[in-house]
């Protein structure tokens, strides 16, 4: 894997810097590195593809070295270099695709394609070994079963979940009380509602709670907490739990009271925040517990009192909500996030070449399915294919 990264890094630098008019002295070190790559690869044969519709391709390396010059690189020099670069880039691209479409239930962190296994031979270590990539560094750690650490921006840690619970209901669905939520990606939005605006609740206060377990532990997380849930701020028609009917939700938004967010690890509270909004942080956690209250306004102008009458019919429904968004965090496991296109890269290649469903990943690389059942086998395979996708993205956009 590190050899593949070193190949890709060398080729990227060569493609960017070996251009007509450049002083040879400015790229002499790169050209020496490039020649070392050619020397190491010459005389070797590889085969890629042969799974799904990914075609079989044979690769033979027999290239001349780039020479030295006292002056600028001319058009002939650059054209010779470009022909070699293009062949190598095509080779790396096909090795990456061949690796990204394969999976294994056992030791899925190790190379699965014949071409990448061959590149793991000791003789290829002479290709300017480079371990500067976060993905390569963590792949080496995971391969030795040592602790890894990935930094993510808006990590997709929450499987998609959109539903509701009713703490008070009737067949007519005309005086409901409960919670509804939408968890997806890096964001939780939860709303508590009471059609009667807590008229019969103790002290005219309704208490709500929303608990979200994570599939992996997050550490050093920067989080945004807001006293609102905008996705539940407009009228909608909702299917009943049994699917027999529908009910109308017409929210009027109030500010939540006594808001508390707890971050827990193995059932123990690690961080707690009360009535604090904006940016907060959490050290390490595997569960988030949100609690908040809906309080009936003790004093109301006539216009507000019309919205919240003391008896039915309740045409407007008092609602309070919270939004929690994980902006950045560290995780030992690889995740899809907002700053990378690795999941899309892997998925698009598997779709383009009609790769059959294997023993590890769900059909279509469905992320909700994958993260909901994030087994050690899936974790190993996903880290490997994401590492390869990160290497491919250096050359192929």
Swiss-Prot record:
This is Intermediate capsid protein VP6. Pfam families: Rota_Capsid_VP6. InterPro entries: Capsid_hemagglutn (IPR008980), Rotavirus_A/C_VP6 (IPR001385), Virus_capsid_a-hlx_vir (IPR008935). Keywords: Calcium, Capsid protein, Intermediate capsid protein, Metal-binding, Ubl conjugation, Virion, Zinc. The lineage of its organism: Viruses, Riboviria, Orthornavirae, Duplornaviricota, Resentoviricetes. The VP6 trimer contains a zinc ion located at the center of the molecule. The zinc ion is not essential for either trimerization or transcription activity of the DLP. Zinc-depleted VP6 has an increased sensitivity to proteases. GO terms for molecular function: host cell surface receptor binding; metal ion binding; structural molecule activity. The N-terminus is blocked. Sumoylated with SUMO1 and SUMO2. Sumoylation of viral proteins seems to have a positive role on viral replication. Zn(2+) binds at residue 153. Intermediate capsid protein that self assembles to form an icosahedral capsid with a T=13 symmetry, which consists of 230 trimers of VP6, with channels at each of its five-fold vertices. This capsid constitutes the middle concentric layer of the viral mature particle. The innermost VP2 capsid and the intermediate VP6 capsid remain intact following cell entry to protect the dsRNA from degradation and to prevent unfavorable antiviral responses in the host cell during all the replication cycle of the virus. Residues 62-73 are annotated as: Interaction with the inner capsid protein VP2. Ca(2+) binds at residues 266, 286. Its main location: virion. One of its GO terms (cellular component) is viral intermediate capsid. GO terms for biological process: fusion of virus membrane with host plasma membrane. Belongs to the rotavirus VP6 family. It comes from Rotavirus A (strain RVA/SA11-Both/G3P5B[2]). Changing residue 121 to G: In strain: Isolate temperature-sensitive mutant G. Homotrimer. Interacts with the inner capsid protein VP2. Interacts with the outer capsid glycoprotein VP7. Interacts with the outer capsid protein VP5*. It is found in: Virion.
């Amino acid at each position: 894997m590190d050899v593949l990264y070193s190949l890709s890094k060398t080729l990227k630098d060569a493609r960017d810097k070996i251009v007509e008019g450049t002083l040879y002295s400015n790229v002499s070190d790169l050209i020496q590195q490039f020649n070392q790559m050619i020397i190491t690869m010459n005389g070797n044969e590889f085969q890629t593809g042969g799974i799904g519709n990914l075609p079989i391709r044979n690769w033979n390396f027999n290239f001349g070295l780039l020479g030295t010059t006292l002056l600028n690189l001319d058009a002939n020099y650059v054209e010779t270099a470009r022909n070699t670069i293009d062949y190598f880039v095509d080779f790396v691209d096909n090795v990456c695709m061949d690796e990204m479409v394969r999976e294994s239930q056992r030791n899925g962190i190790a190379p699965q394609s014949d071409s990448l296994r061959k590149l793991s031979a000791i003789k290829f270590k002479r290709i300017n070994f480079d371990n500067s990539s976060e993905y390569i560094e963590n792949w080496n750690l995971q391969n030795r079963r040592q602790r890894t650490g990935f930094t993510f921006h808006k990590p997709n840690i929450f499987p998609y979940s959109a539903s509701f619970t009713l703490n008070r209901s009737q067949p007519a669905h005309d005086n409901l009380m409960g919670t509804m939520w939408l968890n997806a990606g890096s964001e939780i939005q939860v709303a508590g509602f009471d059609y009667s605006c807590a008229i019969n609740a103790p002290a005219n206060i309704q208490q709500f709670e929303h608990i979200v377990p994570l599939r992996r532990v997050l550490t050093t997380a920067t989080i945004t907490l807001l006293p609102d849930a905008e996705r539940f701020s407009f009228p909608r028609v909702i299917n009943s739990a049994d699917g027999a009917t529908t009910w109308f939700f017409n929210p009027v938004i109030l500010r939540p009271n006594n808001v508390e967010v707890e971050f827990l690890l193995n059932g123990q509270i690690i961080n707690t925040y009360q009535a604090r909004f904006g940016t907060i942080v959490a050290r390490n956690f595997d569960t988030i517990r949100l609690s908040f209250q809906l309080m009936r306004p003790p004093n109301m102008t006539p216009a507000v009192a019309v919205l919240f009458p003391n008896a039915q019919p309740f045409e407007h429904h008092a609602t309070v909500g919270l939004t929690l968004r994980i902006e950045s965090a560290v995780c030992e496991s690889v995740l899809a996030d907002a700053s990378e296109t690795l999941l899309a890269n892997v998925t698009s290649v598997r779709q383009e070449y009609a790769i059959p469903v294997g023993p590890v990943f769900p059909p279509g690389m469905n992320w909700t399915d994958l993260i909901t059942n994030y087994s050690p086998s899936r974790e190993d395979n996903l880290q490997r294919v994401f590492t390869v996708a990160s290497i491919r993205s250096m050359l192929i956009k």
